[in-house]
A protein has these predicted regions:
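Hydrophobic alpha-helical segments
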Residues: 296-416
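Hydrophobic transmembrane alpha-helices and their membrane-interface caps
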Residues: 277-325, 678-727, 767, 794-798, ...
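Alpha-helical transmembrane segments of integral membrane proteins
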Residues: 28-35, 260-268, 284, 288, ...
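Hydrophobic, glycine/alanine-rich multi-pass transmembrane helices and their short helix-loop junctions
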Residues: 267, 355-398, 402-403, 666-670, ...
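Alpha-helical transmembrane segments of multi-pass inner-membrane proteins
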Residues: 23, 27, 255, 259, ...
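Pore- and gate-forming transmembrane helices of large, multi-pass membrane proteins
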Residues: 253, 282, 321, 334-371, ...
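Alpha-helical transmembrane segments of multi-pass membrane proteins
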Residues: 15-19, 251, 255, 276, ...
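Extracytoplasmic
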Residues: 1-259, 287-299, 303, 436, ...
Length: 811
């Protein structure tokens, strides 16, 4: 690489910017305005399935399930009265149920003791009624109601806890967004022309975050109105978790963005103490941030949980480019008094380094673009775009603004008076720190490298203890109501999250087949016991068409408990299903398809880390396959499967992104320094901090989740920036003097100052995440900030030590 010609090219580029400054400014304003016009289109997606790519096979199966059977994610409202069957409580429960149906939007169904089906046979007739359709008005009636409710198998762990102390209201929302023009479920048992149905399906979108928020807001408003000592309420369920995460995400983004702007303002003031030194970098980074979000809106990409770090990240990274350019510009301008010449000099001196640092940071982020986790891939793409936009504004808009607006000059002082003044300033303190770094790294180079090697070995031992985890509930504070409620309901109902088994008989009315019904019955009974065989999980409620058949069969046989079994003859199965359907109940729609070809089995389990679900999903699939007759197909889906797939994709994504980032950044370093051996050596200060942080996580038991897995590639992309500036300047000064120590000294006293400042800003940009209420962001911010600080230490101590050992302390 011919640096001289490249630097000359940047000087020529600066000349053209200066010559056409007003035209350049107008062009930048127009392009920026066009981008900004798309900002209102930005959306938010905190759904669990939002982590995966849209074409992920597991997600596609889950979407097919939702299209057929509706949304499985429910809001669970738990009420713990003093007496569950007291007339006053039942009256209030009925009112509460009615208000939910009347006021909560996007509803599909509400189920409680008020309207749960009660199947009974009377006078040779099958009756499927609401449990509280005939409200008991006597002690004997209430006693019978209590006995019927507590002894009914279908109500256990669904609407009533085993000890009878708790009852629930289950709220199911529509699967599809009403904004898309489609109804919730047109499948059911309605007939529609095939072409019309297909067209409607393509137009549908699933319930949006905004609509989910409307549901949660309406529910919580009712809960607040009814909450009391006689009606104590807890609320759980995935829709609530999604809304809590969204609110936290919006609050954190707003808080962290404003804090980051304030931090940047403060450090720019301390560093430059000039209006242009504060305002121009702020304009650059704010435009870079807003343009990045606008690009997301333009592409139809929603803000998701991982991408919430983008604002603080783009602000922190973007200011580094401006600081490096302005540091050189002001030093030159104060010395010569020629503003335009100082602009040319600054771009000629720093232009290549800014491009290389931007490209390496973008490469570190873009390595996520191949991730199997869709949200992480989007972070990689738009994080890289934000870095490149910051480079664009720094190299084009920043010099243009400097050329247009007046810049205050600090008159150049004699070296003695300047040194005397700087001895009592932040700059003087920084110079003493850098002098100490030069002394330690060059006089004790072998010791520095030896200590680094020991740290590396210890870190590798820690890395072997790393564990992947994905549990969005653990991201929330322990005392937050949704987490407390989920723990309570998992304990009392044995489950708030479901795994869904879909069984396809392969033919119309295949569910009349006694073999298939017998297999479904066996599967449902076995699922009651296997949970505690795996990871100590107690299986909760099982729901399927088997419940309907058993209830109907019992009702048609004088309500005798001995007949709570599935019929064994095809004709009897068909008759009982037909009788149930004609009874007026629509419960069958949620359990089988309209052709009676496909059946659904739901199993509720406690909320745990996704790693606990992987073995369960595999075991469920194995047992289902063993029980079903030959030719009958099955698949396991549901929210639990989404969690398990997210964890699997997380591990694959991390391995891919780390490998790609390390390879690409190494190639770019080799290209920059123009030497393979030197390029490889220069990667040591970049990789060591990441290794230490990962080792620290393993030793302390901090998990690798969807956020902390990002640390390696992000930190590598950022750490290499300082190394690029160090190597770029070291080679320049070494060519001039041929003296290693002198080259290191000049490097740290020019680029070193900017490296320290940008590291402080960058690390604070991530450390502010520790102010979040979400545990995953606290871990991510603290660990990434730690990696960035370690990277600076590596570039101030390890990189000079390596150069001393490679080139020797000779003139």
């Amino acid at each position: 690489m011919n640096r001289t010609s490249i630097e000359s090219g940047f000087i020529t580029f600066a000349d053209r910017l200066i010559r056409w400054k007003w035209g350049v400014l107008l062009a930048v304003v127009i392009l920026t305005a066009l981008l900004f016009s798309h900002l209102p289109k930005i959306t938010i997606d905190t759904s669990n399935e939002g982590f995966l790519r849209a074409d992920d096979p597991v997600l596609l199966q889950y979407n097919e399930f939702r299209e057929q059977f509706g949304r499985e994610e429910v809001v669970l409202i738990a009420i713990r009265p003093v007496d569950l069957f007291a007339p006053e409580f039942l009256t209030k429960l009925k009112q509460f149920h009615a208000e939910i149906e009347a006021t909560v939007p996007h509803l599909d169904e509400v189920t409680s003791l008020v309207n749960v089906r009660y199947t009974v046979g009377k006078d040779d007739e099958l009756l499927v009624e609401d449990l509280l359709e005939a409200f008991p008005d006597s002690d004997e009636g209430r006693k019978q109601l209590k006995q019927a409710a507590l002894n009914h198998p279908f109500y256990q762990d669904l609407l009533i806890s085993e000890n009878g102390a708790l009852t629930t209201v289950v709220i199911e929302t529509r699967a599809f967004s009403e904004e898309a023009g489609g109804d919730a479920l047109t499948d059911g048992f309605e007939d529609a022309p095939a072409e019309e149905s297909a067209t409607a399906e393509t137009e549908r979108t699933f319930l949006t975050d905004e609509e989910n928020g409307e549901v949660v807001a309406a529910v919580m408003q009712l809960v607040e109105a009814y909450q009391g000592e006689d009606f104590p309420i807890e609320v759980a369920g995935s829709p609530i978790v999604m809304e809590v995460l969204k609110k936290s995400m919006q609050s954190d983004m707003r808080q962290f963005t404003l804090t980051m702007v304030a931090i940047i303002f403060l450090f720019l003031f301390l560093l430059f103490r000039r209006v242009t030194g504060i305002l121009t970098p702020l304009v650059v980074v704010i435009l870079s941030l807003v343009a990045t979000i606008a690009l997301m809106a333009l592409s139809g990409t929603a803000l998701k949980l991982p991408t919430q770090i983008l604002p603080s990240f783009v602000l922190a990274v973007g200011v580094g480019d401006s600081v490096h350019i302005l540091s050189i510009f002001y030093r030159r301008y104060d010395h010569t008094g020629d503003k335009l010449e100082a602009i040319r000099f600054a771009l000629g001196h720093s232009g290549l380094a800014v491009v290389m640092t931007s490209l390496t940071t973008a490469a570190g982020l873009f390595s996520f673009s191949t991730a199997e986790l869709g949200a992480v891939a989007e972070l990689g793409v738009f994080g890289a775009a934000g870095v490149l936009l910051a480079m664009f504004y720094s190299l084009i808009l920043l010099p243009t603004l400097l050329a247009i607006f007046p810049v205050r000059r600090k008159h150049h002082k004699s070296s003695d008076s300047e040194a005397d003044e700087e001895g009592n300033t932040v700059t003087g303190m920084m110079d003493r720190l850098l002098n100490r770094a030069v002394s330690v790294s060059t006089n004790h180079a072998a010791t520095v490298v030896f200590v680094a090697a020991i740290l590396f070995i210890v870190a590798i031992a820690g890395i072997t203890q790393l564990q992947f985890k994905h549990d969005v509930m653990k991201w929330l504070p322990e005392e937050i109501p949704i987490r407390v409620a989920t723990d309570h309901l998992d304990r009392d109902l044995n489950g708030t999250i479901s795994v869904e088994v879909i069984v396809d008989s392969g033919e119309q009315e295949g569910l009349y087949n006694p073999q298939i019904i017998g297999a479904l019955s066996k599967i449902q009974d076995e699922l009651d016991h296997f949970g505690d065989e795996l990871n100590g999980l107690d299986a909760g409620k099982r729901i399927s068409v088997i419940d309907v058949l058993r209830e109907t069969n019992q009702a048609l046989n004088e309500n005798q408990a001995a007949y709570y079994v599935t019929p064994k003859e095809r004709q009897l199965i068909a008759q009982e299903l037909l009788l149930f359907e004609n009874s007026g109940s629509d419960d069958l729609e949620n359990l089988v398809d309209s052709e009676l070809r496909t059946a659904r089995i739901t199993l509720r389990l406690p909320w745990r880390d996704a790693g606990s679900y992987t073995a369960i999903v595999d075991e469920v699939q194995e047992r289902v396959d063993q029980a079903l007759p030959e030719g009958v197909e099955s698949q396991v889906t549901g929210l639990m499967m989404i969690f398990a797939r997210t964890l699997d994709a997380m591990m694959t994504s991390m391995a891919q992104s780390y490998t790609i980032a390390a390879f690409v950044v190494t190639m770019m370093m080799i290209l920059l320094v123009g030497h393979i051996r030197l390029g490889l050596i220069s990667m040591v200060p970049n990789l060591l901090p990441i290794t230490i942080v990962l080792g620290f996580m393993g030793i302390t038991g901090l998990p690798l989740d969807a956020f902390t897995m990002l640390i390696g590639s992000i930190a590598l992309g950022l750490a290499v920036d300082d190394t690029v500036h160090f190597m770029h300047n070291f080679q320049r000064y070494y060519r001039q003097s041929g003296d290693t120590v002198e080259a290191i000294t000049h490097t740290l006293h020019t680029a070193g100052r900017a490296m320290v400042v940008t590291t402080i800003v960058l690390s604070l940009g991530f450390l502010i995440f520790m102010r979040s209420d979400m545990n995953n962001l606290i871990n991510f911010g603290g660990l990434t900030g730690m990696a960035i600080i370690l990277a600076l230490l590596a570039d101030l101590l390890l990189a000079p030590a390596l150069m001393t050992l490679v080139f020797g302390k000779r003139n």
